[in-house]
């Protein structure tokens, strides 16, 4: 049974006898998915039928062919798995609100379940339904182990304030998922034949950013990637995770972003290991506390992608150093083409453009240099988000917005020694990177 704290009822109707749909969005899987499970519970409770629907929006937050291809190939695998279990799946291209309203009227839906999502655009879509439909509507948080609304009811200052709140509730929410069984074929919903190649071709999107081949999408591959990380990489994670030349990271972030794997499943598998150590502690800190801190920031601060509502000390130091002379100033086009004076930064940009996944340490360095070499912090934030969302497989995500805000505006950080341009925002430089890893090796790899 889904814990009631995961569920928020956002619209109610006395008319409860009717069909159920699970509007899949952020959590693109049916295994280990509390939203799907809750919709299935409603199906059983009301002795009715249920289908999964997915809204295929054009040009979602400037996503490109790279991200859409990864997502749609994952959805095709999901669709095939659901088909085998006689669970109907509908792909609805076009405006999400209008297409869902039409679907709900056509099939006389009485219960709608959707994924929790803190981003403005998703909440706008959800409000468009809750404000206009007289049916029962529920939000379920299956993306976070401790549901974001339960973890905290306000914007937290940093990991140090959210961590104890999560730790107090973690054991309660870290339960095992039930198995999903095959069902009888439905009468009301038809098992659809979906041409995913045609769906991909129909999209009005940027086709210049091409898919990457080093990572394969889908729930099955996500689980293989997890088990490879546990068996081959986890034992050195804490020592090597800040070395971009070491293949020490999990590579799970694209799967987490698209919901092709559950953070809760990852944690459950990691915690099965016989001996807890600093590698496990470090990884779970990133997976749980830092990831959920990003959702917290975006949930309780609708200006998550700009410099409104940043910490007071950061706002003051940015104003104090706004007019400081910059030694270098680059345009968006120069940043995008990796045409700066610094080979290390150019290598990081090339890594992102070529692979769709910049190393975590370099993401911090990359964003801080954009602050240093832009006309203003506001311009730096726009450039960093634009490039991150355009090229990263895991772009358009709370983690990305908060990562840029941390680097550029001191969000979830503290004041550091004051210096030109940065003020009291944490500083990173080339010499610091040299002390951490073989900079020349990294540069040669990505600038060749």
Language model features: what each stretch is:
Residues 1-177, 350, 369-374, 379, ...:
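Trp/Phe/Arg-rich N-terminal binding region typifying the photolyase-homology
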Residues 16, 148, 154-310, 437-448:
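Glycine/tryptophan-enriched, flexible segments
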Residues 26, 243-440, 446-447:
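Active-site-proximal binding-pocket segments
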Residues 31, 70, 74, 218-221, ...:
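Soluble or luminal CAZymes and related metallo-dependent hydrolases
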Residues 35, 74, 78, 222-229, ...:
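Alpha-helical packing segments of well-folded alpha/beta enzyme cores
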Residues 65, 69, 213-216, 220, ...:
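Charge-dense, low-complexity intrinsically disordered segments
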